[in-house]
Structure formats: structure tokens, C-alpha cells
UniProtKB/Swiss-Prot annotation:
Record key words, sorted: Amino-acid biosynthesis, Hydrolase, Methionine biosynthesis
Protein family: Belongs to the PNP/UDP phosphorylase family. MtnN subfamily.
Superkingdom classification of source: Bacteria
Any single GO BP term: L-methionine salvage from methylthioadenosine
Protein's name according to its UniProt entry: 5'-methylthioadenosine/S-adenosylhomocysteine nucleosidase
Iron as UniProt keyword: no
Function (record text): Catalyzes the irreversible cleavage of the glycosidic bond in both 5'-methylthioadenosine (MTA) and S-adenosylhomocysteine (SAH/AdoHcy) to adenine and the corresponding thioribose, 5'-methylthioribose and S-ribosylhomocysteine, respectively. Also cleaves 5'-deoxyadenosine, a toxic by-product of radical S-adenosylmethionine (SAM) enzymes, into 5-deoxyribose and adenine. Thus, is required for in vivo function of the radical SAM enzymes biotin synthase and lipoic acid synthase, that are inhibited by 5'-deoxyadenosine accumulation.
Pathway named in the protein's UniProt entry: Amino-acid biosynthesis; L-methionine biosynthesis via salvage pathway; S-methyl-5-thio-alpha-D-ribose 1-phosphate from S-methyl-5'-thioadenosine (hydrolase route): step 1/2
GO CC aspect terms: cytosol
């Protein structure tokens, strides 16, 4: 099995990258892909860049060039569920765009023409992630993750997301674009991210302060998940 892992920022991939043995770097389309073995398992780790276009471009290049069997999207996210704290884990059961609106033509808010309203994560990957969470004794929430090209840092943007997606547990900027590409390629995916901030008016300050905490927690989760997927 070859496992594809995608993070947007240097801070989100550096700990995983340092753990890859026999590492080689591939530069394509402004993205960097690091291939090798993570604890004996073949992996391809993509640093995509921030935002939906960068994530979709990178995911496409990763799938075409490295042919992974599954995709794990890792990194940080803003917490929407009331129980979430910095360092807690969110696991997707679905991903949706929070900034797409073609409702004038009868589509659901967040749905693009020709696409489902949401992109479902793979049940087996979800189950494996939840098993890792139990083993590591981490606090986690599973649910809807929403994505858009905005850092949510204020009451207006937050209120709009809560209105349109009352069940969303986290918000970030890449996951749904990655899920969209995986849907088109029929490749199973799951989003496993750690909370770096709670989406509110102080979220930019929390993000800067706690990104390293989120990166450490998400790296721990991904490393454990890769082991479980490879060896059961």
C-alpha cells in the first residue's frame, strides 16, 4: 500500500517529512512531494500550498505522479464544535465548500454543478482514524468539515458558516478541494486535522500561537494512522 498525505504549510508537513526514510523530493507545479518510507510504509507527502486551488492542483499532481491508494489530509483547522480545544482532533465524515453559492439554479448551498453537495470520506479510513484516537486517548470530534478561501476571523464570517452549516465541526481552507479531486479520481480519502484555533475574532492570534501544537498532534495522528492502515 502507498499512502498519500497532504498538508498545506511548511509547519504542517515538517515533522512528518523529517520521519521519512530514503526521502526524495519532487517539485511539480509549485508543489513539493516527498516520497519514501514512513516506518516501513511507502508514503508520498505533499506540501500543497494554501487555499483551494493550490490544494486541488497539488492533489491532482500527487495522484497522477505517485498513484497513492488512499489520501490523508492533515494539518490544522479552526474549531466550530463547542467541545473542541487547541490540540484536539477532527475527523471528517464529509467535506463541503462554505463559499460556493449557485442556489439560484436550485443547488444546495456549497454545492457546485455536476458535483454532490458534499464529499463523503471513506468509511474504512474513518474507522481506522477513530481506532487510532482511542489508542492515543485523544479528544476528538467526527463530522462535517467545511472549506473556503478565507481565514475565519470575525463574527460575520463565523455566523454565515454556522447558519449554512450548523453541523460543521471545523473550518479550514483546503480539505474540500482535496476531497473533490479524490472523488473525481475515485480514491478514498479522510481528513484528520488538529485544532489550532477556535473560529472567532481572536482566531488569528490563536493560530499563530498554537499552530505548532496542532502540527505536533496531527503528525502523531497521521503517523499512527499510516501504521494501522499498513499493518492493521
Amino acid at each position: 500500500m502507498k499512502i498519500g498525505i497532504i498538508g498545506a504549510m511548511e509547519e504542517e508537513v515538517t515533522l512528518l517529512r523529517d520521519k521519512i526514510d530514503n526521502r526524495q523530493t519532487i517539485t511539480l507545479g509549485g508543489c513539493e512531494i516527498y516520497t519514501g518510507q514512513l516506518n516501513g510504509t511507502e508514503v508520498a507527502l505533499l506540501k500543497s500550498g494554501i487555499g483551494k486551488v493550490a490544494a486541488a492542483l497539488g492533489a491532482t499532481l500527487l495522484l497522477e505522479h505517485c498513484k497513492p491508494d488512499v489520501i490523508i489530509n492533515t494539518g490544522s483547522a479552526g474549531g466550530l464544535a463547542s467541545t473542541l480545544k487547541v490540540g484536539d482532533i477532527v475527523v471528517s465524515d464529509e467535506a463541503r465548500y462554505h463559499d460556493a453559492d449557485v442556489t439560484a439554479f436550485g443547488y444546495e448551498y456549497g454545492q457546485l454543478p455536476g458535483c454532490p453537495a458534499g464529499f463523503k470520506a471513506d468509511d474504512k479510513l474513518i474507522a481506522a482514524a477513530e481506532s487510532c484516537i482511542r489508542e492515543l486517548n485523544l479528544n476528538a470530534v467526527r463530522g462535517l468539515i467545511v472549506s473556503g478561501d478565507a481565514f475565519i476571523n470575525g463574527s460575520v464570517g463565523l455566523a454565515k458558516i454556522r447558519h449554512n452549516f450548523p453541523d460543521a465541526v471545523a473550518v479550514e481552507m483546503e480539505a474540500t478541494a482535496i476531497a473533490h479531486v479524490c472523488y473525481n479520481f475515485s480514491v478514498p480519502f479522510v481528513v484528520v486535522r488538529a485544532i489550532s484555533d477556535v473560529a472567532d475574532q481572536q482566531s488569528h492570534l490563536s493560530f499563530d500561537e498554537f499552530l505548532a501544537v496542532a502540527a505536533k498532534q496531527s503528525t502523531l495522528m497521521v503517523e499512527t494512522l499510516v501504521q494501522k492502515l499498513a499493518h492493521g
